[in-house]
Each structure stands twice: as structure tokens, then as C-alpha cells.
């Protein structure tokens, strides 16, 4: 059965890990406190602040305490859904102001465009919020790449190292598991996808091997028809 869908990770796969850790995270950490203070009454922001209180078991936390919790989560790289949502709102302001441009490797841009033209459906699955995913690709150094994608998945579909998450995504897309090729630089994510029946390809941009998976060092080496 041939590949119909290509599902890709972002960090370390389409985009440099350094962009996320050296550019996006520091930008969010710097601007998040004032953003939360200034927008705490906004419905979409208030909803996420309540989620922070719930997740931290501090239902009475005031805005300043919530800011403290968020900064602690950023420091420990916690994959908390409300943090990801709020970071996405801060990044959106940064992209709109022209202070941020999404990094996407040129080899990934070229391959994604080629696969889209060849009729493959392209989807993203990242621990960053769907909003943040759309910003990286929508305001990228290569322009607006969002027309290439059919959809986006984040941690609301489940953690990336659990097979059930990939089953959830496969069922949402509506194809057979073996018709999906999943791309990632993390072997535990590839293992989880493989356990759910997906085809896998590992990105080792610094070289090396992702054990148990076809491994390439750039998108140039990926041929979906070979899976």
C-alpha cells in the first residue's frame, strides 16, 4: 500500500532546534509576563490562565503567581498545553510585528513543495500549539508555506511518544496507518508511530542513525514512493 500522507515534526526536522530554543523560547519568556498582565481579562487568555491554575493545583493563584508558574514551566521545557497556547499568542504578536521569522530548512521547503505538487497530503504534528505551527510556516523566511498543508496536530491529540496519539491522528485524517509516513528526529516518537502502524523516516541532520528506522540527513534523501 503506497504512501498518501506525510506527517512531519517541526523541531529538528523541518526547522532548526536552535530556532525554537535560541529564538522562540527566549522571546516568549521575555514578553509573556507583560502579555499575560495586559490581557488577563481577554476571554482566550483567561481560559488558559484558568488551565494553568488547574494543572498546577493552585485554583486561587493570582495573575502574578500564574506568571511565576509559566516562567518555571518554560525553564524546565514543560510541554503544558496552556503554556503552549499562551506562547503561541505571544509569538503571533512577534510575527505580526515582523520581529520573528519562522525558520524552515531550504531542503524541507523544496521537498514539501514537491510533495504537495505530487499529490501527497501534508500534515504537521508538533508539541508546539497548532497556532504556533501555523506561525512558523505562515511567516517563514521562505514566505507563507501554510497552503502546502492539509492540517495540523498538537498535544491535544496526545503525547508524541505514545502510540495512541498516532492512532488518533490517523483516524482523524481518515487513511490506513501504513499510508502515512511520519518524519521526526526523535527515536521515541518514531517508535511510537511505528507501533501504531505508520511508516517512519528519521531525520539525523548531524549524521548518525535512528535505530530501527530509515534515517536520512535532510529532506533531499526522502523518497515517499520507496516506503
Swiss-Prot record:
What does the record's cofactor remark say about binding? Answer: Binds 1 Mg(2+) ion per subunit.
Q: Name one GO biological process term.
A: L-methionine salvage from methylthioadenosine
The record's InterPro entries line, in alphabetical order, gives: Enolase-ppase_E1, HAD-like_sf, HAD-SF_hydro_IA, HAD_sf
Cofactor(s) it depends on? Mg(2+)
| Keyword Transport part of the UniProt annotation | no
- Spell out the reaction equation it catalyses: 5-methylsulfanyl-2,3-dioxopentyl phosphate + H2O = 1,2-dihydroxy-5-(methylsulfanyl)pent-1-en-3-one + phosphate
Pathway(s): Amino-acid biosynthesis; L-methionine biosynthesis via salvage pathway; L-methionine from S-methyl-5-thio-alpha-D-ribose 1-phosphate: step 3/6; Amino-acid biosynthesis; L-methionine biosynthesis via salvage pathway; L-methionine from S-methyl-5-thio-alpha-D-ribose 1-phosphate: step 4/6
Q: What is its EC number?
A: 3.1.3.77
Q: Which GO terms describe its molecular function?
A: 2,3-diketo-5-methylthiopentyl-1-phosphate enolase activity; 2-hydroxy-3-keto-5-methylthiopentenyl-1-phosphate phosphatase activity; acireductone synthase activity; magnesium ion binding
Q: How does it assemble?
A: Monomer.
Protein family membership: Belongs to the HAD-like hydrolase superfamily. MasA/MtnC family.
The protein's name in its UniProt record: Enolase-phosphatase E1
Query: Could you tell me which species this protein originates from?
Result: Pseudomonas fluorescens (strain Pf0-1)
Q: Which gene encodes it?
A: mtnC
